[in-house]
Amino acid sequence: MLISKNMPWRRLQGISFGMYSAEELKKLSVKSITNPRYLDSLGNPSANGLYDLALGPADSKEVCSTCVQDFSNCSGHLGHIELPLTVYNPLLFDKLYLLLRGSCLNCHMLTCPRAVIHLLLCQLRVLEVGALQAVYELERILNRFLEENPDPSASEIREELEQYTTEIVQNNLLGSQGAHVKNVCESKSKLIALFWKAHMNAKRCPHCKTGRSVVRKEHNSKLTITFPAMVHRTAGQKDSEPLGIEEAQIGKRGYLTPTSAREHLSALWKNEGFFLNYLFSGMDDDGMESRFNPSVFFLDFLVVPPSRYRPVSRLGDQMFTNGQTVNLQAVMKDVVLIRKLLALMAQEQKLPEEVATPTTDEEKDSLIAIDRSFLSTLPGQSLIDKLYNIWIRLQSHVNIVFDSEMDKLMMDKYPGIRQILEKKEGLFRKHMMGKRVDYAARSVICPDMYINTNEIGIPMVFATKLTYPQPVTPWNVQELRQAVINGPNVHPGASMVINEDGSRTALSAVDMTQREAVAKQLLTPATGAPKPQGTKIVCRHVKNGDILLLNRQPTLHRPSIQAHRARILPEEKVLRLHYANCKAYNADFDGDEMNAHFPQSELGRAEAYVLACTDQQYLVPKDGQPLAGLIQDHMVSGASMTTRGCFFTREHYMELVYRGLTDKVGRVKLLSPSILKPFPLWTGKQVVSTLLINIIPEDHIPLNLSGKAKITGKAWVKETPRSVPGFNPDSMCESQVIIREGELLCGVLDKAHYGSSAYGLVHCCYEIYGGETSGKVLTCLARLFTAYLQLYRGFTLGVEDILVKPKADVKRQRIIEESTHCGPQAVRAALNLPEAASYDEVRGKWQDAHLGKDQRDFNMIDLKFKEEVNHYSNEINKACMPFGLHRQFPENSLQMMVQSGAKGSTVNTMQISCLLGQIELEGRRPPLMASGKSLPCFEPYEFTPRAGGFVTGRFLTGIKPPEFFFHCMAGREGLVDTAVKTSRSGYLQRCIIKHLEGLVVQYDLTVRDSDGSVVQFLYGEDGLDIPKTQFLQPKQFPFLASNYEVIMKSQHLHEVLSRADPKKALHHFRAIKKWQSKHPNTLLRRGAFLSYSQKIQEAVKALKLESENRNGRSPGTQEMLRMWYELDEESRRKYQKKAAACPDPSLSVWRPDIYFASVSETFETKVDDYSQEWAAQTEKSYEKSELSLDRLRTLLQLKWQRSLCEPGEAVGLLAAQSIGEPSTQMTLNTFHFAGRGEMNVTLGIPRLREILMVASANIKTPMMSVPVLNTKKALKRVKSLKKQLTRVCLGEVLQKIDVQESFCMEEKQNKFQVYQLRFQFLPHAYYQQEKCLRPEDILRFMETRFFKLLMESIKKKNNKASAFRNVNTRRATQRDLDNAGELGRSRGEQEGDEEEEGHIVDAEAEEGDADASDAKRKEKQEEEVDYESEEEEEREGEENDDEDMQEERNPHREGARKTQEQDEEVGLGTEEDPSLPALLTQPRKPTHSQEPQGPEAMERRVQAVREIHPFIDDYQYDTEESLWCQVTVKLPLMKINFDMSSLVVSLAHGAVIYATKGITRCLLNETTNNKNEKELVLNTEGINLPELFKYAEVLDLRRLYSNDIHAIANTYGIEAALRVIEKEIKDVFAVYGIAVDPRHLSLVADYMCFEGVYKPLNRFGIRSNSSPLQQMTFETSFQFLKQATMLGSHDELRSPSACLVVGKVVRGGTGLFELKQPLR
């Protein structure tokens, strides 16, 4: 049997990564490249050059000399460049460096303990079979063994572990299947990473006791080595072993050549190969004798890729070579030079011993006479220097071939292998993940309301180009013959015929006879020897009813691609789209373009017709809200058509019904007229009813619906009605929509019913009759409303609609006049100034607030101003709207538009008729310039609200220039935001999608990742599909009950009941209820033994047992235990029964898809509540319902079961899209500007990035909130607790600082600058209420800490001057040098974390983000510099000082390092105060009792301050009240002068006198809890959970909450953190009024915490993924490729990314199963 070209007969099962060995590459290569010129002078490939024809043709003109094929058939052949000197393999350079660092160069062994090696080896072996728990078991075995035998030998350890390992490996059931799971991969990479990090830095070799050789790497191209000063030789070293460190090298520093590194590595492999082979498992060569060859770390020759993959591009006559070729050419040039140099050195016998002499014949000939001119181009003195230099140059050129970033010094870079793979333009993302497609069209879209909502208008141009391959059969041959005869240019025609053997016949556009001939032979089989299988295939044009996929970019969520049926429009040039679909695509018609794709197989078409069709996409997966809906004109038309008093004559009625039902097949049902005399009239409501009863499918009962319209009942009321007892204004009003059996009886239809809003008419039709019917309803209503506007109504808007009555206008003017005087009052209120304060005083204070560092007061002024002007704008709006308008609704067309939801909002009408109101930028009033003006036309600090952006003008009468300017500022802000936002949210969405792409609901209803690991046992914790749950709310139950007949019929209730038995689930629910009725208080649950012991306790006590306490148990307890054990079975069972736990929820016991009525507990309670309510209602009502109570319950349970999520649903992608898509609507910089009484919170995309992408341990605005217990005692004490937790800075208690500067000359040389600093503190009364502090404490702080800080900062300022250098220098000792290495290492780790925070910026985000990441980088560099300078200058002083210094130096990292002063709170932690809580109860002791106040004591205090630093000359302080102190500082005269006062002020603002670790501020806010009771909540900025635990009697710790997810996870465990993640994401969206279904959030949170720790969705989080291809297609492809190669990873091709890369069908959706055909 012939296999046709496109018949798959083999399938990819997996991909493994590994490295070719040198021998294999030699065999693969067809040519050794030796000629550095790749093209000769004529532009043809030169022999032995990089474009040699043996490597395959470089363009279409040439023929391959290896396989003699042309360009299109030869796939190319590898060549190689032989390197005269060995170089390091750039891929493995970092690992080689670690290996050299962690091994002894003397005895060639690893320096880590033997136990570590054997443990890791066994752990890696058990992980290969997926035995995770064995990893920890092995650690336990080893620890136990080491405790028993303190000094075991390596073989003993091995035996101990080996036994357990072999047992595990042999008893394994899964085979290697278990190894490709996320947890195993994570564990493996963790163990290996830990090994490299922790065990590669021993101080000396444990085997031969030699010290460590220090290896350094420079520029990724050379290794330098410092040998140890002492080497221990073992006596019996055999001659055969490679020598260790030679005598001459001891203590020297030198350059480690690749050759000597290779020798060491080979020796190391002999000793440690058994272990290292496992560590680098990816490099085992199965075909070779030895397992793994260390020569992989080195390159002896370089592979040259085939020419076709680096083509020469031609532009006119010029030729540009490919970047890869340039890189290889640089290597070639070096090779030629090195060969010459080596030949010369061999001639002069100056070769170093590690370089072999050249042996080839050519080189021997060349030894005779060598031109020495080339030496001048090489750097270096002697020949050996020159050799080493060019060797390093060769190394860096080889590096560039792999990765052009590796050479930081080269300016013009050509892409290396890494650059070809990575980023958006790389191979993975551009050519494997996304590919260009055929059979697609793109054009501008324009609106059309006459096609169906599920159609798309296709212009003729596209219709004749897009074709579909249709097999010819006897029943369609007629049609296809006609198509072939019509040819490629006439629609419906065909462009090509594919014959049975796969050959193609193109149909000629001009030759009619050729087409006819082909048409006649469509069914006659082709003549040929073997009988071919199959038939001819005709590529026919698109015709009406074909399905196309439409897509508009950006494709942010599932509805951005939907399937539409084609409708061919002959005269058009553009795609025509129905208005209703705009919202799904987020399209408008201002020039948007869309893409259409034409599926090419019956399978693809079937999926498009049934699943992707527009009718099925009515609800959005984000939160189940409808997307499709009619717009603008249709709203106005529909509302006015269904208003009371709208009548039609017979011909108008028929015309409208016909217009609405143009494509109905069959009879049209009509309604009888509602008015008969004087002549028959039909109402507008009847027209709509006629449509409805004709659209609803024949065999279904029409629907019943009670709902509300968008236009409120109040809007129709012209004047207030007389009060009538029991009158309900909404009953039978136009705002109440009632539909009975498909007839609209009451109410106006507007946006709430056919717009994109939930629970309207269209949504209800979708729920009961399915998507097809709801689509028809939308289509027909659109046609009907359009016709009504065209024929009978028309709609316009004039000036009359916006005019205001004169009376209202006068009122408006008066309020505006009043508003101009509110300024001074607002500033006074904000700054707590007295009423009497003069304007100048107020203005001065305002200026201070504006120019001061702490912007809180200024924000407060802003806030007060906003409150004041809001009041006035509301007043104006009340005066003008709605009764102040000249015309009122419904005559007023503008109001009609706004009320019916067509366009515009009340804000727009107010801006037209009332005033524009307060202009805000980023949430605050327009900022002031430095001069205090907001715009040049105002005075500085002007009080009128107008100057702060309050626009009193309106568009009706025009606005003034400054107001216009403010208005434009607000407009500009919106544009800036949109531009910046896109890249941020786009990258965020990409991160989530790449992580969650594999999560799919399986056939057992679990959600699993692509490697099979269970993320959730039921999707979203109840297994329901979001769009189907919309009517499972108690509010919608009445609708379901009133339409029960339709639902039972459409959902096949009787069939379900005949198959599924609800008894098991119902029985289970009964058991749970029974248990709950017996245990009303679920908190007090006791075990069986406890209940028993309580009962017999008294009896045992009476026995008065006398015996000693054994094992810490009293005799009474032992007696009780004995009695319990001796109790007979029956009595014991009685106790156990009482103590039985509550049965598990039904969902976890009975699978909901198999067992009917197994529903979630919440739903069960909702159904219970509703059925009681319903039963009560039916008793009251006059007519008895046919629906029985049981039937109602069964109906709701059926609806629930039918709402389960289908297997195959890609819930991971839906969750990612549902978080990513709304985040594009969030404005980027929404700050929550804190006034004085509020917390600062990170919002919007920055907060989302913090939670999802970074999962950072130190978040920007950490906070805790705890409700205060509602007891008198607690409410009293919480005030002092708040005071105690608030941190105090020196700046807050300083009144002023006086600085006097003078000059002093003692002798000729000694000139001094003398500063006298006098600090005046605020009186105690000022801060007594707020701060936990006394004047003495401040003074003590100044003396012990502040002056030290001051001297430190002066020293920093003057570091360049030598005088300060001499004060404290300290020699660097050997110990420091040793520590430097350690320090570098720990800093490396820190940098890792830092990087995690700052540098997760992929290409996309960087586009709009250069400034931000630069700033971050700069900040990081500065920080590092800080750390280093700190190391040099640190004094041996108290640790606290460093703490304080660090805090000083890095005020922006305060959150990270608060002064650790819990134990010794300055000023409070004196010896007398035992602990903090005591403060709340004990009265303060007066000061003088603590400190002796004599002259000696004073002298001692002054002396202590003087001793702080030589430059402190004198000190005085206030002995009476402790309200001031004065210090004199005498500095040697410097070259540099600096401003002492600014230095002192800035220090004072940052110096912390008193703080609770981690907490900066405390606030008490009043809120209402769930039960609507008021309660106090304590909010803190900063986090310190253990501190709050001390105050259990004040705070309700059970309800403590914090937004720091790591803190919660560490304190309360991962499940608590999971809930915090959900709540935090929900809160971020809630600020913008965006609802995201909690099921999405729970899935994301579950995924992030899957491994038991909270992991980010970034490249650090994807490290544990079991699919290397998924990692590589995400970010840093090269990194992951190296990793996969080293570990020899295997990709099972299960993840969607991996499937896309190799072209498999993704295992999700319809790809989750396979249809197999019985062949019998």
Curated annotation (Swiss-Prot):
Region (Mediates the interaction with TOP2A): 1060-1155
Signal peptide boundaries: none
Residues the entry annotates as binding DNA nontemplate strand: 429
Residue ranges, annotated region (Disordered): 1365-1498
Binding-site residues for DNA template strand, renumbered to this chain: 424, 429, 436, 1249
CDD domains: RNAP_I_Rpa1_C (cd02735), RNAP_I_RPA1_N (cd01435)
Sequence segments annotated as region (Clamp): 110-201, 320-426
Family membership: Belongs to the RNA polymerase beta' chain family.
Domain remark text: The clamps form the DNA-binding cleft. The bridging helix crosses the cleft near the catalytic site and is thought to promote polymerase translocation by acting as a ratchet that moves the DNA-RNA hybrid through the active site.
Listed name of the protein: DNA-directed RNA polymerase I subunit RPA1
Species of the source: Homo sapiens
Gene name of this polypeptide: POLR1A
